[in-house]
């Protein structure tokens, strides 16, 4: 299974948390990352977004249908994100558009076996792949890309 963790792009501060919209920089970050993702994601990819405006705007940059999942809102628990993604059993790739620190903690758990803080920059995407071999789940990092480098 492929799981792509895409942190929402840069958003305006100081507003009600769920209502914070992307800044001009954030819109550019989202567009850059969406362009890269569009070249690499299969058509069958399932896209799930937090209900926060900044996540919805980030997801919208991809130009594909996506589903808003309340369990991905700021403050999400790692177990809730895994359940929403059907990890590790989904037969199709899944993109999660969400928030720190949950995305970083999820990446840490899948890559290192321990849930701890790991920084994912605004607008960045981490592409994780899980393969099962003889009842072992092996997770590898295929890509970690910041929009600044695109």
Where are these regions (language model features)?
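Active-site-proximal alpha-helix that buttresses catalytic centers in soluble enzyme cores
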Residues: 2-79, 115-123
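Generic beta-sheet signal
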Residues: 3, 45, 90-98
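Histidine-centered catalytic micro-motifs
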Residues: 5-11, 96-103
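Internal catalytic or translocation cores that form aromatic/hydrophobic pockets or channels
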Residues: 77-94, 102
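Extended, charge-rich low-complexity interaction segments
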Residues: 102-107, 150
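Domain-level recognition of soluble alpha/beta enzyme cores
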Residues: 114-140, 147-149
């Amino acid at each position: 299974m492929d799981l792509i963790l895409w942190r929402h792009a840069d958003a305006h501060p100081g507003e009600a948390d769920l209502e914070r919209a992307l800044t001009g920089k954030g819109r550019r970050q989202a567009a850059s990352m969406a362009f890269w993702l569009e070249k690499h994601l299969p058509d069958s990819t399932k896209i799930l977004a937090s209900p926060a405006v900044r996540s919805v705007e980030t997801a919208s940059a991809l130009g594909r249908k996506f589903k808003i999942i309340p369990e991905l809102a700021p403050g999400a628990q790692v177990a809730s994100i895994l359940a929403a993604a059907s990890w590790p059993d989904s037969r199709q790739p899944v993109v999660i558009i969400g928030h720190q620190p949950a995305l970083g903690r999820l990446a840490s758990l899948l890559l290192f076996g321990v849930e701890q803080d790991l920084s994912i920059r605004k607008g960045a995407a981490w592409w994780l792949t899980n393969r099962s071999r003889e009842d072992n789940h092996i997770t590898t990092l295929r890509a970690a890309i910041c929009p600044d480098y695109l």
